[in-house]
Amino acid sequence: LFLKDTFSIAELVIYSIALAVGVIPEAMPLVTTFSLSLGAQKLAKKKVIVKRLSAIEDLGGIQILCTDKTGTITENRLSVVNVFSPNKEETLLYGLMAASSLNGEGTSNNSFDLAIMNAMGSKAKSVVNKIKKINQIPFNPSRRRNSVLIESSYGREIIVRGATEAVLPFTENQYGEDSELARWIVAEGELGRRVIAIAKKRFSKDTYNVSDEESKLVFVGAISFEDPIKSTTKRAIQKARELGVTTKIITGDSAEVAVAVGMKIGIAENTGEVITGEMLFSLLKNEQKEVVKKLNVFARVSPEQKHNLIKLLQEDYEVGFLGEGINDGPALKAAGVSIVVDNASDVSREVADIILLKHDLKVIVDGIEQGRKIFINVTNYVKATLASNFGNFYAMAFVTLIIDYLPMLPIQILLVNLLSDFPMLSIATDNVDRKNILNPKSYDIKELIYLTTILGLVSTVFDFAMFRVFSSYGERTLHTYWFMGSILTELMLIYSIRTKEWFFKIKTLPSKAMLLLTVLASFLTVYIPFTTFGAEVFKFTYPTRDKLLIIFFIVVGYFASTEFVKRIWYRFMNDAH
């Protein structure tokens, strides 16, 4: 145009800037932030606090969800079920005296302590009053036991309590695999019950160390505990499976207990579908990958092994990990999405992306679903805005070269941008068809570029059609009807890209915000050219019925063509995959 001396440099610069503003999806950061904020608000109502907004979208992309079983899969409400001992009362008594977290008032926050206290009833508090705790070595995941040095009416004793394999090897009597105790432990474990062993030792000194608790212990008894599966767990795991997410249990419990729970909730089919952390990491790297892909239950996993297991999974999958202990920090950092419960350690809460106020697997699965909806809506916004903007840009840039006037004035381009942007923003609120969220999603930039380019070319074809029809009527007529056609075709595209199926087959209705804003934008698009304001400020001509009818048929033709091209594209992509 400048070369033809049709316009000054200033006019050309203003037009170019307006055209550039029209083609750039400047609202994308706003749409993304708004979508994520909306998702965070919805999750907050379900007792999920999002620390990192983008974690919601990441949550939607996870393929594997790793969790401990206690408190998430189960109720974390232990009850004593069985006692292996000739003297049940003595075993419970020593089990309670070994409670390292028991305070002077006879209360504790340890679920094992609470279960034993409930089993003992009113006797529990009198036990606490009769003992004097002198020293203790707390429980830790590597030892899998704790011990206390107490003074009571029995004298001064070390009492050791913990996992059976962490206590029994240090007792005076050795219990082999064929012993009655060993068979009892296996039987209880196969029922999903957690078993702890209790042993004691006379001791005269005021202080002791680990070596003192590792010899000449006298076996007192073993207690089995039941932790009921949450009523929501099986449905949550089934829903996760429907979303293409595999749930894996990583626990410090025995293999028997872990796989029994796994079988109850449907992630393991038989007792052989479990492996311990030690067994897993004794394998070669390629064997480890095969095992973690195949199995969903991992038992006797130490904090270090848990970290290595998450890293191993993260190499091939998007992983979400739910942890809570102080030792879970490294594993939480290794996971793509780190999730903790509200009473987790400070270290775990610090590195977490998401905090659960409700200890329930269901809320995590709800979060995955919400993340996928956000991903779909953000992707739909990108498709709609790039396809329509590029389509208009191609057409205007080309037409500008062959006519002696601007196909649309800069102020008209900005009005197109304004009226189409608000409905585009409403995509963030749209309802997503359930069929579209059934698999983990990730951005495919190549597909986005190809699809938006193809849809942009469809838009360009219909822009040329409008130019061909209305350019013969003069400059203002072309401006007016191209303005109308540009906005109305963009609005129709919003509804087309909502689904990969035919538009009329989608069962989920658009959001109220989308319906309201598209109807309002459509009304203003048609109404403004009829007004004096439209004529004076935007230089529109008064529309006529016959030309409005032409615009109507062009818009309908555009929508039908877009639907047809879209279906061919997705069918081609499905065949390619």
For each feature predicted by the language model, list its residue ranges:
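Juxtamembrane helix-loop transition segments at the membrane interface in multi-pass membrane proteins
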Residues: I9-L12, T32-S54, L78-V80, L357, ...
